[in-house]
Amino acid sequence: MSEQTSMSIYLSNEKTKKYLQSILGERTNQFITSLTSLASSSNYLKNCDRNSLLACALKAASMYLPFDPNLGFAWAVPYKNTATFQIGCKEYIQLALRTGRYKALNSRDVREGEFVGRDFVGDPIIEWILDDVRPEKPVIGYMAGMELTNGFRKIIFWSIQEIEDHALKYSQSFRKYKQTGKSSETLWASQFDKMARKTLMKSLISKFGIMSTDMQDAIKSDHSSLKIDFDTGDESIEYPDNSTNLEKLSEMEESKNES
């Protein structure tokens, strides 16, 4: 049985389709077509548990965001045959802008010579160098900055070491990769730049920004494995790439306590 047929049959199950219609309404058929196509065309998702992949796609749909890794908003990454929900830096920016409370929002790398110190409240002072010289300089860290419509501004900066320490603390796969040097399932190994930008943006918004319900849901769901009970409509959530789910909860609590 082909992957497309398998997913198509799974989604056309009466109980599954009824649940989808209760959530998506008139968007149901388009959703089924898109997810079936994704499952058939993606080699890295072909062995993923169907329920977890569906739950990831539904999470993106609930936020009205495209579920496609090529667009950089929301997608799924396999972890031991389970689809884990991934959110890009673009999604955090998109959800923030929807609140109407953000005037500017950005995250980028910081090159050697650009970080010159901190001001009297501890915010980083960054002096950007010329674009034609910049690519020649090594990346020493990442920053994220925002300005709200009420005039509040905040910038945060993490060094490369601080970002790696964060990844090592919360990702089993990245720890294994650093220990063995072998290929890993974690995006921290294959897409460090994107993960660093997203991590800084996520930290900035969760600690200092204004968060809508969708933004809170996005932060909670990022890197999670989701499961749906079609009988009750309940959604369960786990964080398989953390050593324990308690570590993920600890990370979320740290964001609250530091805000």
Positions of predicted regions on the chain:
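Glycine- and charge-rich intrinsically disordered segments
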Residues: 1-18, 215-259
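Binding-interface segments
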Residues: 3-211
